[in-house]
Curated annotation (Swiss-Prot):
Enzyme Commission code: 4.1.1.31
Record Pfam families: PEPcase
Protein name: Phosphoenolpyruvate carboxylase
Domain of life from the UniProt record: Bacteria
PANTHER family attached to this UniProt entry: PHOSPHOENOLPYRUVATE CARBOXYLASE
Organism the protein comes from: Marinomonas sp. (strain MWYL1)
Active site positions, chain numbering: 138, 544
């Protein structure tokens, strides 16, 4: 075992011992022995392949025991996650100290230099880079915010214990503090009593920025400065550089969420302004206290007059103005808006004055001071601006159609919803070019229509830098885009807000190119976009609609087609990737995903959603956040400067055929098998999931619908809970079998090695199959499903075995993910702790369905859901 792995195991053992002590103190040594016995039975069951003794022990638990037992395994898995997350920090620091850390940006620059790229070309690529990470609060984060804070504190204590030459007294102090925090966590309810509000979710997103990203961003820039200085004469990059920025959907995503209203969105924009001002005030205060220097250049002297402390003079002015900005935002939040005079409307004034101080320090021989915390604040200002994040607004296309229908009916023009596409476009373009208002003066819209119109009015009253894109869910025609343009115009929005169609189903992905081409043929629209087009690619719903393999190929083809189209029209395309945390929703390592995009489709710009629990895993700790930013930056630069070769035509033909076969097989089960819906509802906790207060958005689009109305997140969550992982692989077994039987085995292996797109797909499939456990899924079935439905379960498990064997054959592996020992080991270590939660959950589902009012059973059931999600390290 490496020293690195030994460190991880030691931390897991330490945290586990602290948890055991907390449980023993609370519930007695006998309870701890019972939990340990269950763990040993689980471990033995894994080794022997027979979990009968474990199942018997869990079934014997009475209703009063099940909650603490479920909590014990849930909390241990959360502590394991903390240890693993900190281990990534430990490993990086160890490698840096040994001089063996591979910085992804530095490695890329070395490769580019060897390929004759100049420093100027590389810096130019970085300067033109536009990466926007969009934080979203889909209902995937199962851990309570109060527990997240405790987990962050645990990580800090592990860091303190990791220091070389720590004194025994200090070590004792930090271990005592660990025990205290873990005991606090044990005595804290894991399950919220109420769902978080959209504002709660937004505050959590802002907290990630405050506690991690605000520190990570300047550190990331210092790494960039260091890496680029090896190839450039300059020792730092331009001060206004901002290759990565942040946006959010928290408080702006109203698609299917009636809790997100125009008032909520306005409140979130003001909260963002307040938080940004608060962060700047803290840093300005520190700078003002430190910057006692008296010598300055002529430019700064001209600004401050004969002040004896020129730097403090400027910083005091900035701090006071930022305080006024914070007070203005607070007054607006309290419903007592002030005039808003003498506040920061944008960040330019702040950065201009900070750069004035910076240049003065350089001119006066104080370079070491200039390049300290002042430079860090300049970098933060360039990245976060005056608003911290830009807020996207998302709404379903049908809501705009409903609003326009109400207006046309009022005027006696007929029903807009019933018009064909040509009639809709003609009406919209006439109104867009009209000088008279569209909205009737004496008209009372329905509450739903009024909310849509109020949202546009709210945008018009806000500032441009508070908003990102207006995303249209389920976009399927040019009129969907023009409708939003008309609403923006009618509401008096004084800036060209980006209007972004989101293509979600396979059919809409296939139609994306002709839809955008029609828009480009409209002079008004082409003038509006001013040479830049953004399109969002939906991963979740396309996979749910057609199966993962068909959806993945459909997404690739749509991006290719849009890239060609925009190049033909001289339009700069930004693709917005709506990826989730799981494979079934397009998840996976970001750098791998970016490098597997079609050649030319990245072109220096990309937007990506960072969803739910993945935000914490990728950005929750500054060290890990820096690494994540490095990976994004290097991947976008590589994809832009040295894109992969286009796939061979024969590879495309194979993918076309496999995607068709996969889609037909997937749909024949999901839509065509008469037992599918009753089987799904009986064997998974899909119905019970609605009880878990995961997020502010309802799990279903409609309360009366079947699988098609279920959102992609709970759809995947439900299958993951029983370890069948069906959305990520169903259809792939038939597709890959077809490829092999057509005599293309060696070509498929060649595609895996030489085509980044197919390589990424097969490797992600390999990983998710390694997390599947057909024996566990079978137990759920035996405990919960009638014999008349069990034939479908046997069919599905047979297909799971088939696809697993095919992946191993294609990759020449004896075992799944044999080529990724880190993930393989993580899964193997976790399984003995997750297994009891699965078997317990199946038993709880059985009890709950017999007695829905049993509070202890229902609480334990929700704890098992949270624990399994934590153990699997992803939810939906």
């Amino acid at each position: 075992m490496s020293d690195s792995q030994a460190s991880l195991r030691e931390n897991v053992r330490l945290l586990g011992d602290c948890l055991g002590e907390s449980m023993s103190n609370h519930l007695g040594e006998g309870f701890l022995e019972k939990v340990e016995n269950i763990r040993l039975l689980s471990k033995n069951g894994r080794q022997s392949g027979d979990s009968a003794a474990l199942i018997q022990a869990l079934e014997a638990l009475d209703d009063k025991e099940i909650v603490p037992v479920a909590r014990a395994f849930n909390q241990f898995l959360n502590l394991s996650n903390i240890a693993e997350q900190y281990h990534r920090v430990h490993r990086r620091r160890t490698n840096e100290s040994l001089g063996v850390y591979h910085n992804p940006v530095g490695d890329l620059l070395t490769r580019l230099s060897k390929q004759s790229f100049t420093a100027e070309q590389m810096i130019s690529s970085l300067q033109s880079q536009s990466i926007e990470l969009v934080l979203t609060a889909h209902p995937t984060e199962v851990v309570r915010r109060s527990l997240i804070r405790k987990y962050d504190n645990i990580s800090s204590e592990l860091e303190a214990l990791d220091k070389d030459n720590i004194l025994p007294l200090e070590e004792t102090k930090h271990i005592r503090r660990l025990k205290e925090i873990i005991t606090q966590a044990w005595h804290t309810d894991e399950i919220r009593e109420d769902r978080p509000t959209p504002v709660d979710e937004a505050k959590w997103g802002f907290a990630v920025i405050e506690q991690s990203l605000w520190q990570a961003v300047p550190r990331f820039f210092r790494q960039l400065d260091e890496q680029f200085s090896e190839f450039s004469k300059e020792d730092r990059l331009p001060l206004d550089l901002a290759p990565i920025r942040f946006a959010t959907w928290m408080g702006g995503d109203r698609d299917g969420n009636p809790n997100v209203t125009h008032k909520v969105t306005k409140e979130v924009t003001l909260l963002a302004r307040w938080m940004a001002a608060d962060l700047y005030i803290k840093d300005l205060n520190v700078l003002r206290s430190e910057f006692s220097m008296t010598q300055c250049n002529e430019a700064l002297r001209a600004r401050v007059g004969d002040s004896a402390q020129p730097y403090r003079e400027v910083l005091r002015h900035l701090e006071n103005k930022m305080l006024a900005t914070k007070n203005w935002a607070k007054a607006c939040l309290d419903g007592k808006p002030t005039s808003g005079e003498d506040i920061f409307l944008d960040i330019q004034e702040l950065t201009d004055d900070l750069i004035l101080c910076y240049q003065s320090l350089l001119d006066c021989g104080m370079k070491v001071i200039a390049n300290g915390s002042l430079l860090d604040l300049i970098r933060c200002a360039a990245t976060f601006g005056a608003t911290l994040v830009r807020l996207d607004v998302r709404q379903d296309a049908s809501r705009h159609i409903d609003a326009l229908s109400a207006i046309t009916r009022f005027y006696g023009l007929g029903d807009y919803a019933e018009w064909d596409e040509a009639s809709r476009q003609a009406f919209l373009l006439t109104e867009l070019n009209s000088k008279r208002p569209l909205l009737p003066m004496e008209w009372t819209p329905t509450a739903e229509v009024k909310e849509v119109l109020d949202t546009f009015a709210m945008i018009s009253q806000g500032q441009q830098n508070s908003f990102g894109s207006y995303v249209i869910s389920m976009a399927s025609a040019p009129s969907d885009v023009l409708a939003v343009a008309l609403m923006l115009k009618e509401s008096g929005v004084g800036f060209p807000m980006r209007i972004v169609p989101l293509f979600e189903t396979l059919a809409d992905l296939d139609n994306a190119e002709p839809i955008i081409e029609q828009l480009f043929s409209i002079p008004w629209y082409k003038s509006y976009i001013n040479g830049r087009q953004e399109v969002m690619i939906g991963y979740s719903d396309s996979a749910k609609d057609a199966g993962q393999i068909a959806a993945t190929w459909g997404q690739y083809r749509a991006q290719e087609a849009l890239t060609r189209l925009c190049k033909k029209h001289g339009i700069h395309l930004t693709l917005f990737h709506g990826r989730g945390g799981t494979v079934g929703r397009g998840g996976g390592p970001a750098h791998v995903a970016i490098l597997s995009q079609p050649p030319g489709s990245v072109n220096g710009a990309i937007r990506v959603t960072e969803q739910g629990e993945m935000i914490r895993f990728k950005f929750g700790i500054p060290d890990i956040a820096v690494r994540s930013l490095e990976l994004y930056c290097s991947a976008v630069m590589e994809a832009s400067l040295i894109p992969a070769e286009p796939p061979k035509e024969e590879w495309r033909a194979i993918m076309d055929e496999m995607a068709e076969v996969g889609m037909n097989q997937y749909r024949s089960i999901i839509r065509g098998h008469e037992d599918f819906v009753p089987y799904f509802r009986a064997t998974t906790p899909e119905q019970e999931l609605a009880k878990l207060p995961l997020g502010s958005r309802p799990a279903r689009r409609r309360s009366d619908g079947g699988v098609e109305s279920l959102r992609a997140i709970p759809w995947i969550f439900a299958w993951m809970q029983i370890r069948l992982m069906l959305p990520a692989w169903l259809g792939a077994e038939s597709a890959l079998q077809q490829g092999v039987e057509s005599g293309n085995l060696e070509k498929l292996r060649e595609m895996h090695k030489k085509w980044p797109f197919f390589g990424a797909y097969l490797d992600m499939l390999d990983m998710v199959l390694a997390k599947a456990e057909p024996e566990i899924a079978e137990y759920y079935e035996k405990r919960l499903v009638g014999e008349e439905l069990q034939g479908l379960g046997r069919l599905l498990r047979g297909k799971l075995k088939q696809v697993s064997e095919l992946v191993k054959m294609l990759k020449k592996q004896e075992r799944l993910i044999e080529d990724n020992k880190t993930i393989r080991q993580s899964i193997d270590v976790r399984n003995p702790y997750i297994d009891p939660l699965h078997y317990l959950q199946a038993e709880l589902l059985y009890r709950s369905r017999k007695d829905e009012e049993n509070a202890e059973v229902n609480k334990a059931l929700m704890i098992t859901m949270a624990g399994i999600a934590s153990g699997m390290q992803n939810t939906g």
